[in-house]
Amino acid sequence: MQNLKIQEEVNSLMRLGQHFDDQLKLASVELGDFSDDDLALLDKCAQYYSLLHIHDINLNYLRDFYCAKKRECIENRQTTVQQRVELQRILSSIEEATRDVVMLERFNAAAEERLIPDIVVMQRNAQQLATKQALLDRQKTLKIPKDFSIESVIEKVDSLEQR
């Protein structure tokens, strides 16, 4: 008698397993589609079903679970692609900024080579002021006659050139 009950229970469990496989096929779900984490969750779900003596899986929940996991995977891929694009944009900006810095450093070095020290500039200014003052002093000492006409000098030069 005990043997018969056990055999009936085994047959019942085999029919239940076949029923679940058929329901998974109806949902177009293969167990190979799931990751290890998903399979662990399904194992846990099966344990709860056996503990609670639930013998019918609602396919809608299983489909929702599968779709949610698939959507999550697609969103993660999309996020990864967006982050790669953003990283490329940032890297190209960094590269462009680096080129600009190198160009500005070359310009700065060239400008520093051409730079005249302040002491030299002050000496040149002092020398120019001294020369200007000397020329002004010479001009003051130069006596120009009052009847001097520049036009008559120009005419004489022109006549000499013509001869």
Swiss-Prot record:
Coiled-coil zones: 86-115
Keywords: Cell cycle, Cell division, Coiled coil, Cytoplasm, Cytoskeleton, Meiosis, Microtubule, Mitosis
Keyword Cell division: yes
Main location, first listed in the record: cytoplasm
Effect of loss of the gene: Mutants are viable but have greatly reduced levels of augmin complex subunit Dgt2. Mitotic progression is delayed but is not blocked before anaphase onset and chromosomes are properly segregated. 7% of meiotic chromosomes in spermatids are missegregated. Mutant males are fertile but mutant females are sterile, developing fully mature ovaries but laying eggs that fail to hatch. Chromosome positioning and segregation are disrupted in oocytes. Chromosome spreading in oocytes following nuclear envelope breakdown is not limited as in wild-type and instead is spread along the spindle axis.
Compartments (UniProt record): Cytoplasm, Cytoskeleton, Spindle; Cytoplasm, Cytoskeleton, Spindle pole
One of the GO biological process terms: female meiotic nuclear division
Tissue specificity annotation: In adult females, detected only in the abdomen with no expression in the head or thorax (at protein level).
Name of the protein in question: Augmin complex subunit wac
Role, per record: As part of the augmin complex, plays a role in centrosome-independent generation of spindle microtubules. The complex is required for mitotic spindle assembly through its involvement in localizing gamma-tubulin to spindle microtubules. wac is dispensable for somatic mitosis and for assembly of spindle microtubules in oocytes during female meiosis but is required during female meiosis for chromosome alignment and segregation. It is required for microtubule assembly near spindle poles in oocytes.
Complexes and interactors: Component of the augmin complex composed of dgt2, dgt3, dgt4, dgt5, dgt6, msd1, msd5 and wac. The complex interacts directly or indirectly with microtubules and is required for centrosome-independent generation of spindle microtubules. wac interacts directly (via coiled coil) with dgt2.
High-level lineage: Eukaryota, Metazoa, Ecdysozoa, Arthropoda, Hexapoda
One GO term describing the cellular component: meiotic spindle
GO terms for MF: microtubule binding
